[in-house]
């Protein structure tokens, strides 16, 4: 039997009685957002909508986007990235577990100096791919041209936001490049790596 989303009590300001809301609803009220699945149109629209709403609600408080994603569709990922640059609050990105493919693209899109990885997180970058075998010859050519444009877009963003030269990013995107948290920091994808407290096991 699947476990449902846990519910937690929440009291609106000025109200005496608390109401029960699901835990993600509660976290969203604290401006904490989660990308914990493949990137597709549904989750992209949810995150974009939340960022826009929370920006309208209060454009002075930062947003925090936690990422544990194997990647996914390019265009929905770009939609999240563009919205992060559009909203007025700074968006912190936090990698926990894995930020691969479009997950790493969204990770690097956080406010520079406010991108963090947990100590055992993994990051992977590569070029966009497509299922060419499903396409007819004409569609194959058109799709290949579109992929080249998307690759150019992603490469430019990585260059801009990591500080690496174009040739370094271009070489990295030729294959799957996995990195530890510290390697991702050295590569400019994140700015900080959380430090584990040796006494308590908690991260600080």
Swiss-Prot record:
It catalyses: Hydrolysis of proteins to small peptides in the presence of ATP and magnesium. alpha-casein is the usual test substrate. In the absence of ATP, only oligopeptides shorter than five residues are hydrolyzed (such as succinyl-Leu-Tyr-|-NHMec, and Leu-Tyr-Leu-|-Tyr-Trp, in which cleavage of the -Tyr-|-Leu- and -Tyr-|-Trp bonds also occurs). GO terms for biological process: protein quality control for misfolded or incompletely synthesized proteins. Pfam families: CLP_protease. One of its GO terms (cellular component) is endopeptidase Clp complex. Its EC number is 3.4.21.92. It is an enzyme of class 3 (hydrolase). Keywords: Chloroplast, Hydrolase, Plastid, Protease, Serine protease. Its main location: plastid. PROSITE patterns: CLP_PROTEASE_HIS (PS00382), CLP_PROTEASE_SER (PS00381). SUPFAM superfamilies: ClpP/crotonase. InterPro entries: ClpP, ClpP/crotonase-like_dom_sf, ClpP/TepA, ClpP_His_AS, ClpP_Ser_AS. The active site is at residues 101, 126. Belongs to the peptidase S14 family. Cleaves peptides in various proteins in a process that requires ATP hydrolysis. Has a chymotrypsin-like activity. Plays a major role in the degradation of misfolded proteins. Component of the chloroplastic Clp protease core complex. This is ATP-dependent Clp protease proteolytic subunit. The gene is clpP.
């Amino acid at each position: 039997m699947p476990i449902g989303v846990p519910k937690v009590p929440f009291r609106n300001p000025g109200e005496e009685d608390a109401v029960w809301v699901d835990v993600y609803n509660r976290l969203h009220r604290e401006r904490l957002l989660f990308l914990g699945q493949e990137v597709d149109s549904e989750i992209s629209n949810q995150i974009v909508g939340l960022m826009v709403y929370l920006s309208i609600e209060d454009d002075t408080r930062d947003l925090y986007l936690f990422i544990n994603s194997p990647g996914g569709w390019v265009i929905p990922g770009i939609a999240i990235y563009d919205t992060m640059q559009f909203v007025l609050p700074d968006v912190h990105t936090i990698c926990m577990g894995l930020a691969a493919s479009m997950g790493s693209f969204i990770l690097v899109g956080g406010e520079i100096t406010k991108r963090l990885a947990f100590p055992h997180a993994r990051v992977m970058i590569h070029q966009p791919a497509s299922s060419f075998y499903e396409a007819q010859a004409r569609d194959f050519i058109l799709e290949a041209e579109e992929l080249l444009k998307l690759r150019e877009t992603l490469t430019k963003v990585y260059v801009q936001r990591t500080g690496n030269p174009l040739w370094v990013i271009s070489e990295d995107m030729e294959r799957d490049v996995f990195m530890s948290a510290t390697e991702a920091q050295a590569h400019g994808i994140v700015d900080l790596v959380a430090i584990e407290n040796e006494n308590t096991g908690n991260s600080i």
